[in-house]
Amino acid sequence: MTTFGAVAEWRLPSLRRATLWIPQWFAKKAIFNSPLEAAMAFPHLQQPSFLLASLKADSINKPFAQQCQDLVKVIEDFPAKELHTIFPWLVESIFGSLDGVLVGWNLRCLQGRVNPVEYSIVMEFLDPGGPMMKLVYKLQAEDYKFDFPVSYLPGPVKASIQECILPDSPLYHNKVQFTPTGGLGLNLALNPFEYYIFFFALSLITQKPLPVSLHVRTSDCAYFILVDRYLSWFLPTEGSVPPPLSSSPGGTSPSPPPRTPAIPFASYGLHHTSLLKRHISHQTSVNADPASHEIWRSETLLQVFVEMWLHHYSLEMYQKMQSPHAKLEVLHYRLSVSSALYSPAQPSLQALHAYQESFTPTEEHVLVVRLLLKHLHAFANSLKPEQASPSAHSHATSPLEEFKRAAVPRFVQQKLYLFLQHCFGHWPLDASFRAVLEMWLSYLQPWRYAPDKQAPGSDSQPRCVSEKWAPFVQENLLMYTKLFVGFLNRALRTDLVSPKHALMVFRVAKVFAQPNLAEMIQKGEQLFLEPELVIPHRQHRLFTAPTFTGSFLSPWPPAVTDASFKVKSHVYSLEGQDCKYTPMFGPEARTLVLRLAQLITQAKHTAKSISDQCAESPAGHSFLSWLGFSSMDTNGSYTANDLDEMGQDSVRKTDEYLEKALEYLRQIFRLSEAQLRQFTLALGTTQDENGKKQLPDCIVGEDGLILTPLGRYQIINGLRRFEIEYQGDPELQPIRSYEIASLVRTLFRLSSAINHRFAGQMAALCSRDDFLGSFCRYHLTEPGLASRHLLSPVGRRQVAGHTRGPRLSLRFLGSYRTLVSLLLAFFVASLFCVGPLPCTLLLTLGYVLYASAMTLLTERGKLHQP
């Protein structure tokens, strides 16, 4: 029994009350046991609006489970004529409003492990075979249309429609219409299935980002699971698309009929009819293949997901997509309608600038897109070998097979490339870029989702990429080459000492180092860089059409067998004929790879230096420092970078990732061992006499060292630093946060008076050669003052200035930790019935013994110095 099957009887309270009032209005009394009977008996009661008002009231007063049970009963009992009025409200109440104010059922936060009851109810209600989809098909059979505001579409689509330029996707063809008031209030006339999927897809974009404090795992939320279910249902890897649910036996939902456009549009791409209509025109017997009636749902689902999730990029990218042929067509259209009655309310420049607001996809958005790409690869690779071959492309091929063959290049490739470029250029330089990286790498490896994929190889012997994937690599050359160069530029600006950043470099290097993949990419670049063969007619038709738009069953010219021409058409279709291509295996990219290899070597040494410094600090040193008996570190410790709790395990992971990444880069670009060894030797020359702390990258000029761009980057990111020591009077250093300001100033005045009053006596005591002289020198002489000098990477010179004599420093008594330790000592002494005076004497005696021992050790160390 399902969740909704447990309901034995359903009553809508408001309609039930209405049936009780009816006998007061009519002489003949009648009792109705269901709202449906009352609605059918009294149609003049305006049942649809009354039903909507009742459902709205129940959504506030009733529990969520009861609301869903009521909705299931309404969908089953009421006809489509009455259900179409509640459909827009129901869709908005589920997915939230388009402006993001209403969150609806909050599918992005609903998780089965947190709210198991609500989760199961929602998943059953919104399942592809559930009640909500049954309502969609019920309305679909009656050919109802619903208005969707153009203003909530992605920026590029909205701007082009407001300019009366038809977007390249056939999803918008014959759907744009004006509102009765005119102006810019444009709407799309969508059928119920399109309206539902539009809201479902846009709820990922329009809703506000999840708060940071709310820890929600995207892969466990209801929205993510629903996306996976819809993709598995409408883009099946096995079998055909299940037929739609219907209230009548054997009934099916018709495909959307063509609509007459309400306003004239110019197109900046070659658009054609939908897949279903094109397929029907080529088939002699349509009824023989039931899938031909339903393939439009799969096509619509994919188009909506791609348009809503990937159609986001900057104004510059929008202008770059316009081919010369398209611009001439748009210009001719504008000249022809310049004297027409209709003129856009916004000038052209304003319309193009209408979507310049920055769009930054969230990590959740990227994870959902990655799920789409992984499923599309599995969907496209589910073709049988005889179906995937070019010779199988005939009129006998089913629409679903055609859809599998052309789904990725026809619908996804261009918009995904622009989306990835936008992410690579605008995503913050932090560890969250991992989501974008994995999305990109998932698209680059379709062989991982093939049904005949090999067993994963070990790390020492990765599996070889089969030659059958060479066409995919060549047809997606820019995905591999240009985005790889973009990743190199990002990696050179990140802190590779961080394990998360080191992992990203390792992941990319590992994917591109798969055997035979680098050779395929290099072969594709060679095909593109070959001298261009002039083919006037074909070249104009393909190179000037920047988008793979329209239906993939459109009558294109015969397929060109020349591999070089195919690669050129791919690059020019995405970047234009005037693009400046940077080869991945060219000198510019190789220079970036060498810089990255140098940065990896530096990051390994930096991580090792941090690990060594942490290991050298003994436990007892921190305890004495807390008690205030250790020397004050006036220059601070090495804080090279802001690692997340850097420890030995993190250092080990970083070193492992960087070591393997360096080896993979060497394999991909055939770097010699001598080149990598040169980086290590050059790194050793910049170390100081301790062999640990490294100076930033510099060159020696006439006035000393000059920072290189790499050196500036190292300082900004905390990878390197110059060792700057405090050379002034330690007593005049700024007051620390762990010191009492008023007490420090009082102690400074007291010690200054003592030093001024007894300077001669202290100098005489320190000049003695016996134990008393050593004891006084240990306490009255600044330990590092005599050896202070100006540090310079080029040379060293002693500090010019007068020599200070022995002095007394009482500043350590102004520290909170010193006072707390003294109070703690007095408290412990009081527990043993020791008074303040005896305790003071004991502390003084203990310190004298400690100082005497340190004096002897210091003098013995000086005797052994050369």
UniProtKB/Swiss-Prot annotation:
Q: Where are the transmembrane segments?
A: 822-842
Q: What induces it?
A: Expression is induced by DNA-damage and TNF.
What are the record keywords, sorted? Cell membrane, Disease variant, Endoplasmic reticulum, Golgi apparatus, Hydrolase, Intellectual disability, Lipid metabolism, Magnesium, Membrane, Metal-binding, Nucleus, Phosphoprotein, Transmembrane, Transmembrane helix
Q: In which tissues is it expressed?
A: Widely expressed, with highest levels in heart and skeletal muscle.
The record's section on Pfam families has:
mit_SMPDase (PF14724)
Cofactor(s) required for function per UniProt:
Mg(2+)
Q: Which GO terms describe its biological process?
A: cellular response to tumor necrosis factor; ceramide biosynthetic process; endoplasmic reticulum organization; glycerophospholipid catabolic process; sphingomyelin catabolic process
Task: Provide the positions where the record notes the PTM Phosphothreonine.
Answer: 708
Instruction: Describe activation and inhibition of this protein.
Output: Activated by phosphatidylserine and tumor necrosis factor (TNF). Inhibited by scyphostatin.
Which Enzyme Commission number(s) are on file for it?
Answer: 3.1.4.12
Got a GO cellular component term for this one? nuclear outer membrane
Where, per the database record, does this protein carry Phosphoserine? Answer: 169, 285, 792
- What reaction gets catalysed by this protein? a sphingomyelin + H2O = phosphocholine + an N-acylsphing-4-enine + H(+)
Locations listed in the record:
Endoplasmic reticulum membrane; Golgi apparatus membrane; Nucleus envelope; Cell membrane, Sarcolemma
pH-dependence of activity, as noted: Optimum pH is 7.0.
User: Which GO molecular-function terms appear in the entry?
Assistant: metal ion binding; sphingomyelin phosphodiesterase activity; sphingomyelin phosphodiesterase D activity
The disease tied to this protein in UniProt is: Neurodevelopmental disorder with microcephaly, arthrogryposis, and structural brain anomalies: An autosomal recessive disorder characterized by severe global developmental delay, severely impaired intellectual development with poor or absent speech, severe encephalopathy, microcephaly with simplified gyral pattern, hypomyelination, thin corpus callosum, mild cerebellar hypoplasia, brainstem hypoplasia, congenital arthrogryposis, dysmorphic features, and respiratory problems often leading to early demise.
Q: What does this protein do?
A: Catalyzes the hydrolysis of membrane sphingomyelin to form phosphorylcholine and ceramide. It has a relevant role in the homeostasis of membrane sphingolipids, thereby influencing membrane integrity, and endoplasmic reticulum organization and function. May sensitize cells to DNA damage-induced apoptosis. In skeletal muscle, mediates TNF-stimulated oxidant production.
The name on file for this protein is Sphingomyelin phosphodiesterase 4
Per UniProt, what is the name of the gene that codes for the protein in this document?
Answer: SMPD4
